[in-house]
From Swiss-Prot:
Top-rank lineage group of the source organism: Archaea
Gene: rps17e
Entries under InterPro entries matching the protein: Ribosomal_eS17, Ribosomal_eS17_CS, Ribosomal_eS17_sf
GO function terms (MF aspect): structural constituent of ribosome
Name this protein carries in UniProt: Small ribosomal subunit protein eS17
Source species taxonomy: Archaea, Methanobacteriati, Methanobacteriota, Archaeoglobi, Archaeoglobales
Gene Ontology CC: cytosol; ribonucleoprotein complex; ribosome
Claim: Ribosomal protein is one of the keywords in the record: yes
Organism: Archaeoglobus fulgidus (strain ATCC 49558 / DSM 4304 / JCM 9628 / NBRC 100126 / VC-16)
Family: Belongs to the eukaryotic ribosomal protein eS17 family.
Pfam name, any one: Ribosomal_S17e
Length: 65
């Protein structure tokens, strides 16, 4: 089993998906770039975790586009 994502990662990702549902795709690298542009997150690790969580939600169809 994998680890559970921290709540702050989920909150940031859900807010981004709520504001920009049509922007994000199932491509991690593209989402990583978008998260960097749309937020002021300085930490590379946090940025990647947010992008990964968004990618997972999009690929699983948990986003209302």
């Amino acid at each position: 089993m994998g680890t559970v994502k921290p709540a702050y990662i989920k909150v940031i990702a859900r807010e981004l998906l709520k504001k920009y549902p049509e922007v994000f795709t199932g491509n991690f690298d593209e989402n990583k770039r978008l998260v960097a542009e749309l937020t002021n997150i300085q930490s590379k690790t946090v940025r990647n975790r947010v992008a990964g969580y968004i990618t997972r939600r999009v690929n699983r169809g948990l986003v209302n586009v």
